Curated annotation (Swiss-Prot):
<dbReference type="GO" id="GO:0006417">
    <property type="term" value="P:regulation of translation"/>
</dbReference>
<dbReference type="InterPro" id="IPR023673">
    <property type="entry name" value="Ribosomal_uL1_CS"/>
</dbReference>
<dbReference type="GO" id="GO:0003735">
    <property type="term" value="F:structural constituent of ribosome"/>
</dbReference>
<comment type="function">
    <text>Protein L1 is also a translational repressor protein, it controls the translation of the L11 operon by binding to its mRNA.</text>
</comment>
<keyword id="KW-0699">rRNA-binding</keyword>
<keyword id="KW-0689">Ribosomal protein</keyword>
<comment type="similarity">
    <text>Belongs to the universal ribosomal protein uL1 family.</text>
</comment>
<dbReference type="InterPro" id="IPR023674">
    <property type="entry name" value="Ribosomal_uL1-like"/>
</dbReference>
<keyword id="KW-0687">Ribonucleoprotein</keyword>
<comment type="subunit">
    <text>Part of the 50S ribosomal subunit.</text>
</comment>
<dbReference type="GO" id="GO:0000049">
    <property type="term" value="F:tRNA binding"/>
</dbReference>
<dbReference type="InterPro" id="IPR002143">
    <property type="entry name" value="Ribosomal_uL1"/>
</dbReference>
<dbReference type="Pfam" id="PF00687">
    <property type="entry name" value="Ribosomal_L1"/>
</dbReference>
<dbReference type="InterPro" id="IPR016095">
    <property type="entry name" value="Ribosomal_uL1_3-a/b-sand"/>
</dbReference>
<keyword id="KW-0694">RNA-binding</keyword>
<keyword id="KW-0678">Repressor</keyword>
<dbReference type="GO" id="GO:0006412">
    <property type="term" value="P:translation"/>
</dbReference>
Amino acid sequence: MAKAGKKYQDACKLVEAGKFYTAAEAMELVKKTATKKFDETIELHVRLGVDPKYADQQVRGAMVLPHGTGKSKRVLVFAKGEKVKEAEAAGADFVGSDEIVQKIQGGWLDFDVAVATPDMMGTVGRLGKVLGPRGLMPNPKLGTVTMDLTKAVSEIKAGKVEYRTDKAGNVHCPIGKASFDAEKLQQNFQALIDTLNRVKPAAAKGQYMRSITVSATMGPGIPVQL
């Protein structure tokens, strides 16, 4: 534990107290603070000037990062008939209908994202208490309830990420891995910031973006200029 603590302290020393870094500087620095033996995820944390208690101030959606997240996601598709072949051809890891529902009811959850055709949602709805709390329930707003399974699965495999405000109005989202080039991290960072600005709720008052921080999985937060 002491060794891990020292590595974290050394990483903290790289971050100048009170300084706000440019996006380019922050991406170079966050790579240096990723000192673990595994390929740490680089995360973006944005504090927004919204009150998520109100439905018209909630920020939620999905987007494809230009360079993906560096993580391969296991995709489950709820479908039947011809749509099964489409999902399989698109690269879905698991495809099925009632038998998959029964499997999940039995405790199986070895997937990262679930997609469903609209006609399957009546069946999938029975899994609400299992999938809902885990953020795995297909949602039309996120593009995971759709007839275009080719597009949905392809985008997820290409690095589609979901973003949403927590109870405090913060958005936490991965933008890549420590092994990524700083330039690719910056392009992913900018794409997500641009998206958050584009989906600003009309009801949000005052300053929208309050703070931006990036960090590696086990590293300190690095403040970024607004």
